[in-house]
Regions:
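Basic, glycine/lysine-rich polyanion-binding surfaces/domains
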Residues: 1-199
């Protein structure tokens, strides 16, 4: 089986990361000091590379119909909101645009639910990077990274928005414990470096 590289593979090499194979992807396990990284997660902010997650975009007038076949209830989501099941989450970005995140390797089972897609459907897994920001200071890192007001009373858990972080266009999905950033693979290393600089 062909092993896929994370868009942060250059960062991994530069910082001597210990890597592990995750569902066919070579991903960072730690950067040499797991205890320090765990403490940082509890007290500061950490970035986890989740680029191995499956990413599928749907666009067009029938996107909601196709999204519904993939994730039950997705057609009823309001714009800039989300719906999740056990393996996937659907982001409704506009009236006619969705982005689905799913467990690594689960893309095909989602795509198999559509015998005849009625929307433009693209498997974006290899084309997009994905980070998860965790820890109590992640809000500070995001505040220093964008001009958009991301206060938790304005952007609640379950919300999704599109914004620019350090000149990189991102889709931001907020949960209770994490902020998940989906972006173009091309800009993964520069976004990672910029987030590290502010946090």
């Amino acid at each position: 089986m062909l092993i896929k590289n994370s868009p942060l593979s250059g960062i991994y090499r530069r910082h001597s990361a210990n890597t592990v194979e995750v569902s066919g992807w070579l991903m960072a396990d730690d950067f040499g000091n797991p205890e320090k990284e765990q403490k940082h997660l509890q007290e500061q902010c950490v970035i986890a590379d989740w680029s191995h997650l499956g990413k599928i975009s749907l666009s067009g007038a029938k996107a909601s119909s196709d999204a519904e076949k993939m994730i039950k209830g997705a057609s009823k989501i309001k714009v800039l909101n989300t719906l999740s099941d056990q393996t996937s989450v659907a982001f409704r970005l506009t009236q006619n645009d969705y982005l689905l995140l799913t467990g690594s390797g689960n893309e095909e089972s989602l795509l198999d639910k559509l015998k005849k897609p009625q929307s433009t459907l693209i498997n974006q897994t290899g084309a997009m990077g994905c980070f998860a920001l965790g820890g109590p200071r992640r809000d500070e890192v995001l505040e220093r990274s964008t001009a958009v007001d991301l206060r938790r009373d304005r952007v609640t858990a379950g919300s999704v928005l599109q914004s620019t972080l350090h000149t990189v266009s991102c889709t931001i999905y907020r949960t209770e414990d994490l902020d998940i950033l989906v972006h173009s693979r091309t800009f993964s290393e520069s976004l990672f470096d910029a987030l590290m600089d502010v946090g």
